[in-house]
Amino acid sequence: LVRSSIAAGIEVIALPGPTAFVPALVQSGLPCERFVFEGFLPHKKGRKSRIDSLSSESRTMVFYESPHRLMKTLKQLTDAFGPERQASVSRELTKIFEETKRGTLSELYTYFEKHTPKGEFVLVVAGKP
């Protein structure tokens, strides 16, 4: 239903719950029957190896990210998963400036190059097909 609504250009807004990742997962339009919540990636030590270990993950992946590291994370995920992997970035969930952007990892990177990341982010990435 969510994927069909998005394809038809209908805005999808999930009702908030106790965690930000659930509305972001629903609004992403990506498969949510099976997913893995990764939280924040390590800042430095182990970051690349964690991302590399997820490159073959078949479930949808959910990450939290700060505005200061969003571009770095999108770039690293693009390098590890490929530029065409589908994803979404949601920010400021349940707040006045709530926004969800959907596309490939490379499209999202390009978008945020032009629009300075602000707010709290939830990044949802499709699993490996």
Residue ranges of predicted features:
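A contiguous loop/helix-start segment that scaffolds small-molecule binding in enzyme catalytic cores
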Residues: 59-60, 64-129
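Class I SAM-dependent methyltransferase SAM-binding "motif I" and its flanking Rossmann-like core
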Residues: 1-57
